[in-house]
């Protein structure tokens, strides 16, 4: 019997299933000898488990890179690495996975960030079996969200990812972890019902009855139906992005999470909302998107300004960075709503860029907290001389967050600005107002970020803190993690085509789909209702 070729190998199924199945073996890892009640025993047990988890994460990343090299062509617009297997034929559920330019960059980002998050979790000794089981299960679930091509399967993956986050927050979080975890699960679980209801409605509308995303995208829906489905999806994905006013779970979750969970929340979780808006709202419901596009832009501007202003008022370091994340995701909304190739490309690049920058900042917040045991900015100060490496890394990552030229955030935001300024889908006054307000948000960002750096590292010295023996500089593991994140941040900033070439064909095809009517009529989006009165 001939072995399947590398092109026929189930790469994506393997990448999704491998960490989940490997996690099931964690309870079988033998415990070390000694007294289970001692700290030394807990450290030895955690060390065995963390090395196993890191090995699984690294090998899964290598498998993904091999599949990317063998079977993915960035020049194509359609789905690649496609696999379809009948799973539950009674309800029309199939195991269908594939990747294109909208999903492959985010799949790669997920594998990369999760591997670093597991390395960042090195100090965790509380219930290590459960902790690393959840981390690996979340690894597979998050890749599944970006890879699956079946609506029911997408919903299952979306829900699978929620449970590990809830447990990681509620068990390993801070003092208010139960409140934050409960708020997270209520927001996300309730909003997920909109995905299920809208997905079922689209599947059972017309013929054929199908949950396959390709079939759903090719169905013809009346405008009213599209608008209802679009609104339902927008609520669900707006919680995850997050969009104001559905954002309030995020500062609480970040305020209580540990460093590795921070990295997953900021680096991957928020991107699920942006990806779904592109894939389902814009890709499956293009007519409705013309109506909602200006709404997305307005919401994006509100995100940028409101979150930037809120960040000024925050005195908690984690919450301040969380608010900056909300602000940065506003550019994703503007890019998606711009209806231009460069704007849509900028939105995708902003998701990738923020994934790297957000993960780096929150990791450094965790590293700083491990040494200072406080998150209140008033209690910090003068620690820069004692921690020069952490100060240098924090400064570099903060400069990336404020979109310094030469770093990825600058390129992404400039692309969104150009897309919004040059689009012919909106009137000139609307474009000018949006660009001006977004620019105000960009100006506010360095003010609160640089002020934060000054307060932490060079503010009035807290001698009780600076003279504490635990206040030590970064260790090699921490320097390695930040270096792994800064290299692509700077690399993308200097040569963005390194990443944009992975998805430009897909984002351009999506924009072409959305603009089919506009070039023919010369109408702006504000006049879009006339397009559907024929």
UniProtKB/Swiss-Prot annotation:
InterPro entries: NADH_Q_OxRdtase_chain4, NADH_Q_OxRdtase_chainM/4, NADH_UbQ_OxRdtase, ND/Mrp_TM. Pfam families: Proton_antipo_M (PF00361). Keywords: Membrane, NAD, NADP, Plastoquinone, Quinone, Thylakoid, Translocase, Transmembrane, Transmembrane helix. GO terms for cellular component: plasma membrane-derived thylakoid membrane. It catalyses: a plastoquinone + NADH + (n+1) H(+)(in) = a plastoquinol + NAD(+) + n H(+)(out); a plastoquinone + NADPH + (n+1) H(+)(in) = a plastoquinol + NADP(+) + n H(+)(out). It is a multi-pass membrane protein. Its main location: membrane. It is found in: Cellular thylakoid membrane. GO terms for biological process: ATP synthesis coupled electron transport; electron transport coupled proton transport. Its EC number is 7.1.1.-. The chain crosses the membrane at residues 9-29, 51-71, 106-126, 130-150, 152-172, 184-204, 227-247, 258-278, 290-310, 326-346, 347-367, 399-419, 432-452, 479-499. GO terms for molecular function: NADH dehydrogenase (ubiquinone) activity; ubiquinone binding. It is an enzyme of class 7 (translocase). NDH-1 shuttles electrons from NAD(P)H, via FMN and iron-sulfur (Fe-S) centers, to quinones in the respiratory chain. The immediate electron acceptor for the enzyme in this species is believed to be plastoquinone. Couples the redox reaction to proton translocation (for every two electrons transferred, four hydrogen ions are translocated across the cytoplasmic membrane), and thus conserves the redox energy in a proton gradient. Belongs to the complex I subunit 4 family. This is NAD(P)H-quinone oxidoreductase chain 4 2. It comes from Synechococcus sp. (strain JA-2-3B'a(2-13)).
């Amino acid at each position: 019997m001939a072995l399947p070729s590398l092109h026929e190998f189930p790469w994506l199924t393997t990448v999704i299933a491998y960490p989940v199945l490997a996690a099931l073996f964690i309870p079988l890892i033998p415990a070390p000898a000694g007294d289970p009640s001692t700290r030394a025993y807990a450290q030895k047990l955690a060390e065995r488990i963390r090395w196993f988890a890191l090995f699984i994460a690294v090998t899964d990343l290598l498998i993904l890179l091999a599949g990317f090299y063998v079977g993915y062509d960035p020049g194509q617009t359609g789905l690649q690495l496609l696999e379809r297997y009948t799973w539950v034929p009674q309800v029309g559920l199939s195991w269908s996975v594939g990747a294109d330019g909208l999903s492959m960059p985010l799949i790669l980002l997920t594998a990369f960030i999760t591997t670093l998050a597991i390395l960042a979790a090195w100090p965790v000794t509380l219930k290590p079996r459960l902790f690393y089981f959840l981390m690996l299960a979340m690894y597979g679930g998050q890749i599944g969200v970006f890879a699956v091509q079946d609506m029911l399967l997408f919903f299952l993956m979306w829900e699978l990812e929620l449970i590990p986050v809830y447990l990681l927050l509620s068990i390993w979080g801070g003092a208010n972890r139960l409140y934050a975890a409960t708020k997270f699960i209520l927001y996300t679980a309730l909003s997920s019902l909109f995905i299920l209801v809208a997905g079922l409605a689209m599947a059972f509308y017309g013929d054929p009855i199908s949950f396959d995303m390709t079939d759903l995208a090719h169905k013809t829906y009346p405008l009213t139906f599209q608008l209802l489905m679009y609104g339902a999806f927008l609520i669900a994905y707006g919680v995850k992005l997050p969009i104001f006013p559905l954002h309030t779970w995020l500062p609480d979750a970040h305020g209580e999470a540990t460093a590795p969970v921070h990295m997953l929340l900021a680096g991957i979780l928020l991107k699920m909302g942006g990806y779904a808006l592109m894939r389902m709202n814009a890709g499956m419901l293009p007519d409705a998107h013309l109506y909602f596009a200006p709404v997305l832009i307005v919401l994006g501007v509100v995100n940028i300004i409101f979150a930037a202003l809120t960040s000024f008022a925050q005195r908690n370091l984690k919450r301040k960075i969380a608010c900056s994340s909300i602000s940065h995701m506003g550019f994703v909304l503007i890019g998606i709503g711009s209806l231009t190739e460069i704007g849509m490309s900028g939105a995708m690049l902003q998701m990738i860029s923020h994934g790297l920058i957000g993960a780096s900042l929150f990791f450094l917040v965790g590293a700083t907290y491990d040494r200072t045991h406080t998150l209140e900015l008033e209690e910090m100060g003068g620690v820069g001389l004692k921690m020069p490496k952490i100060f240098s890394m924090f400064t570099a990552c903060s400069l990336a967050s404020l979109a310094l030229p030469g770093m990825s955030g600058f390129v992404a935001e400039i692309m969104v600005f150009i897309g919004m300024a040059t689009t012919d889908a909106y009137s000139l006054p609307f474009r000018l107002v949006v660009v001006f307000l977004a620019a105000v948000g960009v100006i506010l960002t360095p003010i609160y970020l640089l002020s934060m750096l000054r307060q932490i590292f060079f503010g009035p010295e807290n001698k009780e803190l600076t003279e504490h023996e635990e206040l030590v500089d970064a260790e090699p593991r921490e320097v390695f993690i930040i270096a792994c994140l800064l290299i692509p941040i700077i690399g993308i900033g200097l040569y963005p085509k390194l990443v944009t070439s992975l998805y430009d064909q897909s984002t351009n095809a999506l924009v072409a789909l959305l603009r089919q009517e506009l070039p023919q009529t010369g109408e702006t989006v504000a006049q879009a209702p006339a397009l559907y009165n024929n």
